[in-house]
C-alpha cells in the first residue's frame, strides 16, 4: 500500500486524531484543566456504553443497506417504562391516567422486570419495521420513520408529555456499581461487543447477513432466506435497543420522558458510517462501530469541556459525517 492509498483509506481518522491532539493542547490554555485524564477517559467510556448497544443494532441494518430512524424514540420509550417500573414510590406521572407503584416488588426484581418489558417493547416495534422491509420491500427509511412517529406520539399521548420520577438509586448500585473509580457499565458494553462480534463473524446468520447485504438476489439464489435474515437483523437490533435504553436509565438515575433520546438515531447512524459500515451493504466491522461511537462521544465530551456551544458541536459532527460518507461513496465508485 503506497502513501496515497494509505491516506485515502485512513485520512479521516488521521484528521480526527489531529483534532483531538489540538483539543488536548487548547483545553489547558483556555479552561486551565487537562483533557486527557483518567477521569475524563472513564467518563467518555461510561457515556459511550449505552450508545454502543444502539450503534451495534443500527449497524446490522446498515449492513442490509437499511437504517433506523426510530432509535432515539426507542430510548425515550425505554426511559419512560424504566422510570415507571423502577421508581421508588408512587410515580409523578401516569399512563392513560393510571398511576403505577411497583415498590411492593423487590428492587432487583423490578430492575429485571423493566429490562424484560423494555426489550419486549423495543423488539416488538423493531420487528414491525423489519416486517415491512422483509415482506413488502418497503425501504426501512420509511418504516422506521413511521415507527419513530408512532412511538413518540403514543408515549407522549399516553403520558401527556409528563416526565416521570427518578429510578430507585439502589438499582444502579446493584447492576452497574463502581469498583473504585471504574464504572462497571463499561463491562456491559464489552460483553455486547463480544456477543455481536461472535454473531456477525462466527455464526451462519452473520455470514448470511453479509451475503444478503452485499447482494440479496445472489443470496436468495444460493438458498439463503432474505426474509429470515432481514427479520433477524431487526430483532437483534430491537434487543440491543432495549438493553441500551435500560442501561442509559441506570446510568442517568434521572427522570424519563418521551422526548429523551431525541437525536440519538443520528448519533448511532453517524457512528456506524464513520466506523466504516457502508450504506452500499455487506461491508462493516464491529471494531469500526465501536470506534465510531467513541469518536463522537469523545468529541462531544471534549467540546463541552472546552465550552463550545452545542449548535457548533452539531456543525463539527456534520462535517465529519459528510467526509465519512463522501469517502465511502468514492470507494464504492472506484470499486464499480
Language-model-detected regions and their locations in the chain:
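Single transmembrane alpha-helix segments in multi-pass membrane proteins
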Residues: 23-25, 38-90, 131-138, 276-286, ...
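Membrane-embedded helix boundary and interhelical linker motif in transport proteins
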Residues: 63-128
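Membrane-interfacial amphipathic/re-entrant helices at transmembrane-helix boundaries
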Residues: 1-55, 90-113
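Transmembrane alpha-helical segments in multi-pass inner-membrane proteins
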Residues: 241, 252, 256-317
Amino acid at each position: 500500500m503506497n502513501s496515497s492509498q494509505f491516506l485515502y483509506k485512513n485520512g479521516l481518522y488521521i484528521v480526527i486524531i489531529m483534532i483531538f491532539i489540538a483539543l488536548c493542547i487548547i483545553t489547558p490554555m483556555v479552561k486551565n484543566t487537562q483533557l486527557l485524564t483518567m477521569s475524563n477517559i472513564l467518563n467518555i467510556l461510561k457515556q459511550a456504553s449505552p450508545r454502543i448497544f444502539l450503534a451495534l443494532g443500527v449497524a446490522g441494518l446498515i449492513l442490509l443497506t437499511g437504517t433506523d430512524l426510530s432509535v432515539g424514540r426507542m430510548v425515550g420509550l425505554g426511559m419512560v417504562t424504566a422510570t415507571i417500573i423502577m421508581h421508588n414510590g408512587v410515580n409523578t406521572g401516569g399512563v392513560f391516567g393510571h398511576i403505577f407503584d411497583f415498590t411492593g416488588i423487590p428492587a432487583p426484581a423490578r430492575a429485571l422486570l423493566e429490562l424484560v418489558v423494555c426489550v419486549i417493547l423495543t423488539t416488538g416495534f423493531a420487528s414491525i419495521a423489519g416486517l415491512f422491509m422483509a415482506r413488502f420491500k418497503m425501504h426501512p427509511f420509511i418504516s422506521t420513520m413511521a415507527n419513530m412517529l408512532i412511538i413518540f406520539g403514543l408515549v407522549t399521548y399516553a403520558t401527556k408529555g409528563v416526565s416521570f420520577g427518578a429510578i430507585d438509586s439502589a438499582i444502579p448500585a446493584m447492576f452497574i456499581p463502581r469498583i473504585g473509580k471504574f464504572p462497571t457499565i463499561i463491562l456491559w458494553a464489552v460483553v455486547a461487543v463480544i456477543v455481536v462480534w461472535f454473531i456477525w463473524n462466527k455464526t451462519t446468520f452473520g455470514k448470511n447477513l453479509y451475503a444478503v447485504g452485499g447482494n440479496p438476489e445472489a443470496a436468495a439464489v444460493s438458498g439463503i432466506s432474505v426474509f429470515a435474515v432481514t427479520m433477524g437483523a431487526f430483532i437483534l437490533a430491537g434487543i440491543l435497543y432495549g438493553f441500551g435504553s435500560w442501561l442509559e436509565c441506570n446510568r442517568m438515575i434521572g427522570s424519563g420522558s418521551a422526548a429523551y433520546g431525541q437525536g440519538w438515531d443520528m448519533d448511532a447512524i453517524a457512528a456506524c458510517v464513520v466506523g466504516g459500515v457502508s450504506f452500499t451493504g455487506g461491508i462493516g466491522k464491529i471494531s469500526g462501530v465501536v470506534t465510531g461511537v467513541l469518536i463522537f462521544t469523545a468529541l462531544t465530551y471534549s467540546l463541552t469541556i472546552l465550552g463550545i456551544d452545542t449548535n457548533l458541536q452539531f456543525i463539527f459532527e456534520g462535517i465529519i459525517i459528510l467526509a465519512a460518507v463522501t469517502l465511502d461513496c468514492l470507494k464504492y465508485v472506484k470499486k464499480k
